[in-house]
Regions:
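Short amphipathic beta-strand starts and helix->beta connectors
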Residues: 49-56, 94-100, 125-137
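Short glycine/threonine-rich beta-strand-turn micro-motifs
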Residues: 61-73, 144-154
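Short, surface-exposed ligand-recognition loops at beta-strand->loop->(often short) alpha-helix junctions
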Residues: 28-37, 116-122
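Short, Lys/Arg-enriched N-terminal segments with co-localized hydrophobic residues
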Residues: 1-16
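A generic structural signal for short beta-strands and their flanking turns/coil linkers
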Residues: 21, 54-56, 62-64, 95, ...
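Helix-adjacent hinge/juxtasegments
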Residues: 75-113
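Positively charged, low-complexity, intrinsically disordered RNA-binding extensions
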Residues: 18-19, 23, 111-182
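Short Lys/Arg-rich amphipathic alpha-helical segments
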Residues: 28, 32-35, 43, 47-55, ...
Length: 182
């Protein structure tokens, strides 16, 4: 009898959750667009007169970093500017890039590593949860790995939360995905 009640309560809980509207907050970088931007940047670097003999290169390392290398700091800054222009044209947000220190390489050449931020770090996720709670919105916010899920019975609450987060500077590009309504 008690097991049947617990099972029925579990079914009711699932039904109640199914009536909630929800969306996920993510921060992803489209790696294919990054590759395309790197290819375009390399093409422009090869064609530019001031960078022709600079031995500049841009490489994608795995799915989480870009390696820049050039003959000097001036050339590296020019390469970085070209890459940033191409990334913006391809729709990749510069907020998701973290620049490493300039490192000396062989001879006079220098290199720099740029990390791509994939997912929402835990401290940023906690900040998002705190923002929603402080706004006194009737919504449940949960951290699921590198994603934050927001659910509420009222769609207008979810729209207000999206507007609140878009209006805030979080230090990384947020995307709102998996919007589910009933």
């Amino acid at each position: 009898m008690m097991a049947a009640f617990a099972l029925r309560a579990g079914v009711e809980e699932v039904r109640a959750m199914a009536q909630d509207n929800s969306f996920d907050i993510v921060s992803k970088v489209d790696i294919q667009e990054v590759r395309n931007a790197i290819d375009q940047a390399l093409k422009e670097i090869r064609q530019r007169f001031d960078l022709k003999d600079s031995h500049s290169e841009v490489k994608l390392e795995g799915n989480d970093a870009i390696q820049l290398a050039s003959d000097g700091e001036y050339h590296l800054e020019a390469v970085k500017d070209i890459l940033c222009q191409k990334l913006v044209k391809r729709g990749v947000s510069l907020k998701n890039l973290t620049y490493g220190k300039l490192e000396p390489a062989l001879g006079k050449s220098v290199r720099q590593k740029i990390s791509l931020q994939q997912g929402i770090p835990v401290e940023k996720a906690k900040e998002i949860v705190r923002l929603v709670k402080d706004a006194k919105k009737k919504a449940q916010v949960s951290i699921m790995g590198d994603t934050v899920r927001v659910s509420s019975k009222d769609r207008d609450e979810l729209q207000a939360i999206i507007a609140l987060l878009r209006g805030r500077e979080m230090g990384l590009e947020l995307q709102f995905t998996n919007y589910r309504t009933n």
